[in-house]
Amino acid sequence: MHFRVERLELVNPWRIAHGVSTERTTVILERDGGYGEAAIVPYLGESSAEILAALSSFASNRLEHPRAGYRVDEVDGIASRGAQCALDLALHDAEARARGEPLWKILGINAVTHIETSFTIAMDTPDEMARRAREANASILKLKMGGVDDEACVEAVRGVTNATLRLDANGGWSREEAARLLPRLARFKIELVEQPLSVADGEGFAWLRAQQIGVPIFADESVSTLEGVDSLAQNVDGIVIKLRKLGGLRQAHAAIERARSLGLRTMMGCMIESSLAVTAAAHLALLCDLADLDAPLLIRNDPFSGLTYRGSAVLLPPGAGIGAVPREGD
C-alpha cells in the first residue's frame, strides 16, 4: 500500500460560507493496482496527517496479521472517515480492474445513462458571479450563498443566463435568514437549495419546512451517515451524497438506497478533489436523480484524468475499474 499527499491549485478563489481557499490538499492511495482518494475538507475536521496515520496503522496491522486479500467491509473498522474513503475506492478499483469490468458493473448498476452536472460559482460580488456565469456557458449552475449580497448575486446571474439555478448555502444562513431569503429567491426559478442551515441546528430543517419557503431543500453537511438520512427524511426533499463524507462507495451506495426507500431525491456531489474521486462518484451518480461533479473543472493541476465534460454532460471513461488514470509524472 502506497499513499501520498497532493496539493490541488484552484482556478479561482473558493469562497463559501465555511471560508475561502486558493488551494486544497488530498490523499492519494494505491493498493494492488487500485487507486483511492480522500480530500482534506476543512469542515470535516480531519487533517492529512490523521488520515495517513490511520492508513499506516491499518497497513501495519495487516502485515502483523496477514491473510489473502482485503474485504471492502473491513474499512468500516478504521477510525478515520477519510482513510475509509481512500481504501474503499482503491479496493473497489482493484477488484473491478481484476475482473476487467467497469466500476458501475461491479456495483450492480445495469446500464450507463446520461449524467448532467452543475457548474459551481463561488461567492463573490454580483458582477463577478454574473461574469463567471456568462463564461461558464453551462446549462446548470450552482451558486454559493451565505454572503451579504445573496439576493443581488442571484438576480445578477439570472440576468445573464437561462440556466437551471441551484443554490448552496453550506449552512451559512440562520433560520430567519433562510425563511426571509428563499421565498424572495424563488422568483428566479430556483431548482433547489442545499444545506440552508448549520449542521448544529438540529431542529432547523423541520422549522424551515413549516415555513413553506417554495424551494426544495437538499441536506448535505447534515448527512454523513445512514442514520442522518433517516433523521432528516421528513424535513427535506433530497439528500446530497458524497463519497468522502460517507466513507467511500459502499456506504454511499447504501445511503442512496436508503434515501430512495424513504422517497427522497438524491444528488451525487463531490468535494474539491481530483478526477480520481469524482470519476468514482460518477459511477454511482448513475443511480441518482441529480449530479454535481464539477471539481475537475475547478482545479488547475489535476493529478488524474478520468471524466470527459461536454458542456454539462459528463461521460464516463472506457475501460475497467474507476477508469481514472494518473497523469504523466504523477
Please describe what each predicted stretch is.
Residues 5, 19, 32-99:
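Metal- or metallocofactor-binding catalytic centers and their adjacent structured scaffolds
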Residues 38, 77, 119-121, 143-145, ...:
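A cross-domain feature marking catalytic cores of carbohydrate-active enzymes
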Residues 56, 84, 88-93, 155-158, ...:
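Predominant activation on well-ordered alpha-helical scaffold segments within soluble catalytic domains
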Residues 29-31, 87, 100, 141, ...:
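Conserved, mostly hydrophobic/aromatic
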Residues 34, 165-167, 217-218, 239:
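Residue-level marker for buried hydrophobic side chains located in beta-strands
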